[in-house]
Amino acid sequence: FALSLLLSLSVSDVCAQERVYDISQFGLKANSKKNASPVVRKAIAKIKAECRDGEKVILRFPAGRYNFHEAGSTVREYYISNHDQDNPKKVGIALEDMKNLTIDGQGSEFVFYGRMIPVSLLRSENCVLKNFSIDFEQPHIAQVQVVENDPEKGITFEPAPWVDYRISKDSVFEGLGEGWVMRYSWGIAFDGKTKHVVYNTSDIGCPTKGAFEVAPRRICSPKWKDARLVPGTVVAMRGWGRPTPGIFMSHDVNTSLLDVKVHYAEGMGLLAQLCEDITLDGFGVCLKGDNDPRYFTTQADATHFSGCKGKIVSKNGLYEGMMDDAINVHGTYLKVIKRVDDHTLIGRYMHDQSWGFEWGRPGDDVQFVRSETMELIGKQNQIAAIRPYDKGEIQGAREFSITFKEAIDPAINEKSGFGIENLTWTPEVLFAGNTIRNNRARGTLFSTPKKT
């Protein structure tokens, strides 16, 4: 009897430490036209209010489609590495300061409208995202197919059936979506039969000034001339902006993304910065199978890890059709713009898409690099103190005042081009069992001194 009672109490104790929520409890049904953004926002707020520290929490979505619009979404000021720093951002599923949370889509499709970050996860520990896909009803990339290519009259093309467009008053082809209009400057050409990038094409110009319709949904662009684009070629027309990744992670510890697929994002599929220990298993930036009529996925890299540490594991994934690399792992240098004294430097983020977020902490190990030659200068050092220099808080800062434990090498100054590299925020990487195909640019980039 005593053993039975003990087991009963143990099981009850385990059950008491796990809370399960179903999104249908909040009035959101799968496959309805209801805007999911405000409902999910309220559900997350309720979970945060009710759950105690140490409890495991699961938020489940019954399988089906859920539509997220900008209206009712979470609005945030986020500074995201290697993305446009245009704030504020609108977020469909904003997860912040969470512990032991699992979002289980159970095979659901999360479909977004407008210009949004589908999912953000910040300052969280031991969280799992699994079993869902991310897509947009109207991608900001316009897929068109070449139907005629006349050396004198230019290229005639047909937009894909889902592409909404207009010919502007100044005769330019423009893509349309919920709350946005896009003019396209460049494109990537795909073989219409194989979906391979057309050999030796790289980024192609697609000038549409002077465009006109020759028939419904058939457009002639007299100034667009390129003999390589034979009839049947599919072009993903795009701009250079990258405002919103599919999933944004920052300052998280021990995160798993399991069987999550990103079919489109107006940025990178996954951007993780200043995170520790990330596992991707069955993660994909990919099409919806062999019969998907689309040829493209994300506007930039499939996955990107900036200033992370611990171990990054990416396995059993599919990366295809993206407009940049499958994976890029790196840190961000600060340029030395002022030597204050023998222990203090002012460093600045120089990349227009990488600033505004934390760079280092007291106790972090650093080294100094001469930018012209990439030579290491002086000895490794350690941060004793760091604070934003150009504003009162880290958020939105470009410059930092950094005091080091040991004296700085006399050669390091603001005149000769020196960078500061944070060695603490560098990860070990395991990238295995993944498929990369049919994408612009490269495959894998690993810039870390740790084991890869």
Where are these regions (language model features)?
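Extracellular/periplasmic carbohydrate-active domains that bind, remodel
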Residues: 16-452
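Bacterial N-terminal signal peptides
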Residues: 1-10
